[in-house]
């Protein structure tokens, strides 16, 4: 096994793309540190993957919306005698109620979970990765980070754009160190993410099936990309076309087109 057995920390690992990435890493022989807020699903996944693949899988409950959560998470990992060879920044959520109708506390939590926490976790993990001459960092961004802004889910796309740019900067800074950094930019992916934010029926009706991908396929593409040291990967031909168009169209036209989709989704 060319990669060797390493320990990968995955945030938001209890479901969706995070759980799919845990399955991919376990299947490739890596030990796991899985973290999320929900202890039951997290522990069940850890036990299932350990039994299925003969890897060590440790569940550590953490809420990255809480202040200083990344530092406390690393303290808990060290207390268990574990180290982090790879980091998957996957935890995230959205609110689709519009900027003014969303509780400011929810917006603050979004920023902490999807922007501040990845930065802090990266800062905690990278020094040891560089010192050991091996590391993998996969930042789960979104196609939304490459597209024009949408109304309703006002902060989600900008936060994901930040994650893409930060990943590219880290990719440049870690060249020649043995550390690989990749931004994974999935489009519409079948996960429970849409159940949590209440949008599954709306998005399923608004977009054709060919625009959707399976979480396990997205996870495989993402992990293959970080192993290949690609700075960014957007799974799916359709998603790559959309990302390219999003960068080429004039702002006024692009925003008008995206605004039409937002109205179809009742300001999703």
For each feature predicted by the language model, list its residue ranges:
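Conserved glycine-rich cofactor-binding loop
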Residues: 14-15
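Conserved NAD(P)H cofactor-binding loop of Rossmann-fold oxidoreductase domains
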Residues: 90-95
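C-terminal helical subdomain
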Residues: 183, 205-241
């Amino acid at each position: 096994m060319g990669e060797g057995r390493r320990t990968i920390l995955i945030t938001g690992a209890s479901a969706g793309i995070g759980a799919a990435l845990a399955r991919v890493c376990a299947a490739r022989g890596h030990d796991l540190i899985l973290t999320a807020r929900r202890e039951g699903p997290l522990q069940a996944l850890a036990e299932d993957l350990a039994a299925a693949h003969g890897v060590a899988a440790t569940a550590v409950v953490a809420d990255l919306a809480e202040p200083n959560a990344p530092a406390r998470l690393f303290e808990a990992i060290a207390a268990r005698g574990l180290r982090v060879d790879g980091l998957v920044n996957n935890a995230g959520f959205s609110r689709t109620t519009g900027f003014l109708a969303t509780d400011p506390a929810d917006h603050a939590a979004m920023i902490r979970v999807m922007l501040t926490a990845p930065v802090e976790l990266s800062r905690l993990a990278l020094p040891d990765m560089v010192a050991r001459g091996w590391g993998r960092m996969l930042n789960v961004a979104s196609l939304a980070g490459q597209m024009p802004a949408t109304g309703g889910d006002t902060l989600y796309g900008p936060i994901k754009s930040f994650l893409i740019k930060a990943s590219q900067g880290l990719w440049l800074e870690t060249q020649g160190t043995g550390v690989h950094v990749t931004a994974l930019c999935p489009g519409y992916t079948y996960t429970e993410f849409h159940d949590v934010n209440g949008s599954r029926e709306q998005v399923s009706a608004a977009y054709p099936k060919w625009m959707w991908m399976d979480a396990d396929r997205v996870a495989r593409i993402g992990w293959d990309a970080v192993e290949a040291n690609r700075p960014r990967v957007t799974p799916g031909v359709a998603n790559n076309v959309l990302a390219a168009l999003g960068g080429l169209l004039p702002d006024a036209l692009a925003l008008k087109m995206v605004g039409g989709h937002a109205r179809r989704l009742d300001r999703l």
